[in-house]
């Protein structure tokens, strides 16, 4: 391929640290914390910066998922491999998310962060959580399944529902594959359209420091550092549990499959910082599609595992749900015996699968779970409403790492992982990646395109 020398040149070029997205986002987050702490009104006024950045990302998520999934499926030789990939992915998601739920349940019972608070449920202001409870009541198994089917194709893309877009994309990819050579012009158009979408992402990501700055300034300005003190034990317990889950559980999975969790975290450090600033793992979805394919996983695997994982493989959210539910019981002196906790676990095995990777979705699922269990006071949600935003950072970070691990593992299970490329990319740490060029690095389209045809002699 004529693009190979270009890729090697790009991967060996280093840039000054102040030009790296990693450094810029760190500085932006620190400045945002300082502004929010010392000038809270100004910090709250900066909220549109964070909201605007997330909206820009959401604007292109649906078309990027569509292009990635359709191109991956339509370009496959054997359609059985798609079903195999999906089956292995769902198996992995169920096993690991169940482990996450169990770990959260065990830790909260051992540490008991809510014990001794002696909160009277009748004194809690439930008005602030009414919207979450209402949204949570809509979370049922049948409703979730029916919601995956869009009313219209346009509606799926207009609403930006990841699972609806994914479902249509899979069906479209299968249909396009059945057309054979007759459908090749459509596939070529989708490949070229994907190039445009990924280049739009390049432009949007240059605004990531501004988005992280605005979101962090608002969070600190609106809730203040003082709000962390009252319920600090729960927060510290949750953060430590998430860290241990990543290092021990995901680390063990990585070791069993021949790579290091620490190198993987280093490789996606820029995406982690973006998530830290915005509190939403969805903000890093487009770049994760890029990074995972560059890491050696085939496009068809990445296109299925990453979007699906954003609803079915939210490890951080799973830990949060069990810990928060039992914490509310402890704080309100609501007795929970082993039967109640098993019931809670079984309900969460289902309800946790409806949590999308957006800010606040975990809280809605928690409201749905408390309503479904019945034994726990729903009004107790008011206890953690003030710190939920701070806990969402740990949830989103753990979710992102969990989906990165899942993609590599599933790709290896189905024989769609280039292990040599995996090791070389992890060894480099992604430190030399200057800018995403899908036509050069991602294999978004197979074969030459007008974009890479004129750039094959350039040095990036």
From Swiss-Prot:
It is found in: Cell inner membrane. Pfam families: SDF. Responsible for the transport of dicarboxylates such as succinate, fumarate, and malate from the periplasm across the membrane. The keyword Transmembrane helix applies. SUPFAM superfamilies: Proton glutamate symport protein. This is C4-dicarboxylate transport protein. The gene is dctA. The chain crosses the membrane at residues 20-40, 56-76, 88-108, 153-173, 200-220, 234-254, 301-321, 342-362, 364-384.
């Amino acid at each position: 391929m004529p693009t190979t020398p270009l890729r090697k040149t790009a991967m060996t070029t280093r840039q000054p640290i102040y030009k790296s997205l990693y450094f810029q986002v760190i500085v932006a987050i620190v400045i945002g914390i300082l502004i929010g702490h010392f000038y809270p009104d100004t910090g709250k006024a900066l909220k549109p910066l964070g909201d605007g950045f997330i909206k820009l990302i959401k604007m292109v998520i649906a078309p990027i998922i569509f292009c990635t999934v359709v191109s991956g499926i339509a370009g496959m030789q054997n359609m059985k491999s798609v079903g195999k990939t999906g089956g292995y992915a769902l198996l992995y998601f169920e096993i690991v998310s169940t482990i996450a739920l169990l770990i959260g349940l065990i830790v909260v019972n051992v540490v008991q962060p809510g014990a001794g608070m002696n909160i009277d449920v009748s004194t809690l202001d439930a008005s602030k959580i009414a919207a979450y409870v209402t949204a949570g009541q809509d979370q049922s198994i049948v409703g979730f399944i029916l919601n995956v089917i869009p009313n219209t194709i346009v509606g799926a893309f207009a609403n930006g529902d990841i699972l609806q877009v994914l479902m249509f994309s899979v069906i479209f990819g299968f249909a396009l594959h059945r057309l054979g050579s007759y459908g090749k012009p459509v596939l070529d158009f989708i490949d070229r359209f994907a190039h445009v979408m990924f280049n739009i992402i390049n432009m949007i990501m240059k605004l990531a420091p501004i988005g992280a700055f605005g979101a962090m300034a608002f969070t600190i300005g609106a809730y203040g550092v003082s709000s962390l003190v009252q319920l600090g034990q729960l927060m510290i317990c949750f953060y430590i549990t998430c860290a241990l889950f990543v290092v021990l559980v995901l680390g063990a999975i990585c070791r069993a499959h021949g790579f290091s969790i620490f190198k993987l975290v280093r490789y996606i450090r820029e995406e982690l910082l973006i998530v830290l600033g915005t509190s939403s793992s969805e903000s890093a979805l487009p770049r994760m599609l890029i990074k995972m394919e560059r890491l050696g996983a085939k496009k068809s695997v990445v296109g299925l595992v990453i979007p699906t994982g954003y609803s079915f493989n939210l490890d951080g959210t799973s830990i949060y749900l069990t810990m928060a539910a039992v914490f509310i019981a402890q704080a309100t002196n609501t007795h929970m015996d082993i039967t109640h906790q098993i019931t809670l676990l079984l309900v969460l095995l289902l309800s946790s699968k409806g949590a999308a990777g957006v800010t606040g979705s975990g809280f809605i699922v928690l409201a749905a779970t408390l309503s479904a269990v019945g034994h726990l006071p729903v009004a107790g949600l008011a206890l953690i409403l003030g710190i939920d935003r701070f806990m969402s950072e740990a949830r989103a970070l753990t979710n992102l790492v969990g989906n990165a691990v899942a993609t590599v593992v599933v790709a290896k299970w189905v024989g769609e992982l280039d292990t040599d490329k995996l090791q070389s990319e992890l060894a480099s740490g992604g430190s030399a990646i200057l800018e995403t060029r899908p036509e050069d690095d991602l294999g978004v389209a197979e074969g030459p395109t007008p974009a890479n045809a004129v750039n094959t002699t350039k040095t990036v």
